[in-house]
Amino acid sequence: MTREELRKVIIPQNLRFTEHEDTVPRSILPELAKLAETPHVLIITGLRRAGKSTLMKQINEMLYSSKQTYLNFEDEKLLSFTAEDFSGVYETMLELNDKVEVVFFDEIQNVEKWEIAIRRYHGDGLKVILTGSNASFLSRELGTKLTGRHLDIVLYPFSFREYLTFKKTEVARNDLYVPVKAARLRKEFSDDFNRGGIPEYLRYGREEIVKQIYEDILIKDIIVRYGIGDERSFRELARL
């Protein structure tokens, strides 16, 4: 990709990334902030749509402010992106922001041989924070290049406490001993159990969101990644 093509992707993505959004602070955020103080590459993995990109935004607001470069590899404009293009990204990001201290790469597994480029960024003293939907795949590939120099963080969908924060439901220590409040908490727990903790689904309530997550996991993370030829039989197996 040319430098101009990269600029047309990097600039708007970073503008969106740095826009403040009213989101639920994830309970893992304090732990992640401590890990960010280490020299290790951080790998945030977890279910698709569990909120990994939002967690990146939260840690950026907490620690880095305007010292970051962000790139999401699920952008259709990056379909032709290859590992060789990381050099252009490196040069472009310094051209746009010479105060860069950290790079955030979202869904990095979409680029083959990405781990080679990450070694260079890390070697040049930049903090590197990655997300991906396949924990074992990311750890295995990065481990071949940065043995002992990366840390894995798994992000799960909302916990019950995070769900209550999303619903703006305040809970006091003794609420379980007050019948009316205890009944309300039981109802909230039942709703959380039945709906799950996917932030996007909770926000919009559309069943299509959950169905699309299922399809993405099935196709992108399993069938394509592992070269499964008999898709029909695999789908039947997945429905069991």
Question: Where are the language model's segments positioned?
Answer:
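Hydrophobic positions on the alpha1 helix immediately C-terminal to the Walker A/P-loop
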Residues: 55, 59
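Conserved lysine of the Walker
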Residues: 52
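Hydrophobic anchor at the beta1->P-loop junction of P-loop NTPases
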Residues: 44
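Structural recognition of the conserved hydrophobic beta-strand(s) that form the central parallel beta-sheet
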Residues: 127-133, 154
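Interdomain hinge/linker elements that couple catalytic modules in large macromolecular machines
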Residues: 2-17, 22, 161, 165-240
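Pre-Walker A adenine-sensing motif
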Residues: 19-36
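Short glycine-rich substrate-engagement loop in P-loop NTPases that contacts/grips substrate
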Residues: 69-101
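Short regulatory helix/loop adjacent to the ATP-binding pocket of P-loop NTPases
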Residues: 136-152, 166-168
